[in-house]
Amino acid sequence: MFRQVSVRALRRAAGRSVCASRAQMVRHSSTLGGGKGSYNLDMPALALAAGVTLLAGYMVYPRAPKAKQAAVQSVAPVNENVEQASASLQASAPVQATSESAEAGEEEAYGEESGAVNEEAAGEPEEAAAEVGETQAEQAPAVETEQAAEAEQAAEAAAEDKASAGEAAQGQQGAYNPDTGEINWDCPCLGGMAHGPCGEEFKAAFACFVYSEAEPKGIDCVEKFQVMQDCFRQHPEHYAEQLESEEQAVRETEAAAESAKSDEGH
């Protein structure tokens, strides 16, 4: 509205200026025919008219299409930005879904691994207990065999002790007089062992056995019998029979020990 009013006012002013200029030009042109008058043109009025005409043209030129075009151009990038944002959201949605599914798969795999580890940890004590039971079951026969071998050796040693004690007892019955408490070293039952190279050692061992009050009888005379056996080995020509009996007893003891070891190996 303001532009229309301004344009109208400028047109009126321009019209008045042009009319005034034409009137002056008519007045002065009448003098040209006789050559007496001079051609006088009002230049300020023409300049004002030209300026008003240019300003009117500038004011009349439509500016709305440019503004509309600028508005359309400004709206287009906004629409493009909205479309790009929507496309980005749509593209990010599958990625987010994929990442969530991947995380869910990792959690499930971790849960399965944890369950497997727990099962293995729970199974280890049972396996260890089973192995201990098998080891004990395998060791039990060996222990029983070893105990049986030890018992057998003890029985053999006891039998040997009984045999020696029996011989000593037989000699004691003939050589020892319980009424007087004396020992007859010349008794034939002693086989002359009291008068040989190891007679003193024999007497010490025999007397220890006769007067022993330990249980079993003669158990406190082992050292004296050992001294007597050592003396026998130093004089094999006189005590061959006794040494042979001793060697036989040693062989039997070694055989029993080897048999026990072979049983343990099986």
UniProtKB/Swiss-Prot annotation:
Motif stretch (Cx9C motif 2): 221-231
SMART domains hit by this protein: GCK
Record text on cofactor binding: Cu(2+) or Zn(2+).
Keywords for the protein's UniProt record, in alphabetical order: Disulfide bond, Membrane, Mitochondrion, Mitochondrion inner membrane, Oxidoreductase, Protein transport, Redox-active center, Signal-anchor, Transit peptide, Translocation, Transmembrane, Transmembrane helix, Transport
Biased composition (Polar residues): 87-98
Transmembrane segments: 45-61
Skewed-composition ranges (Low complexity): 130-157, 165-175
Cofactor(s) this protein requires: Cu(2+); Zn(2+)
Cystine residue pairs: C187-C189, C198-C231, C208-C221
Residue ranges, Mitochondrial matrix side: 29-44
Organelle targeting peptide span: 1-28
InterPro entries to which the protein is assigned, alphabetical: CHCH, CHCHD4, GCK_dom
Name of this protein: Mitochondrial intermembrane space import and assembly protein 40
Organism of derivation: Eremothecium gossypii (strain ATCC 10895 / CBS 109.51 / FGSC 9923 / NRRL Y-1056) (Yeast)
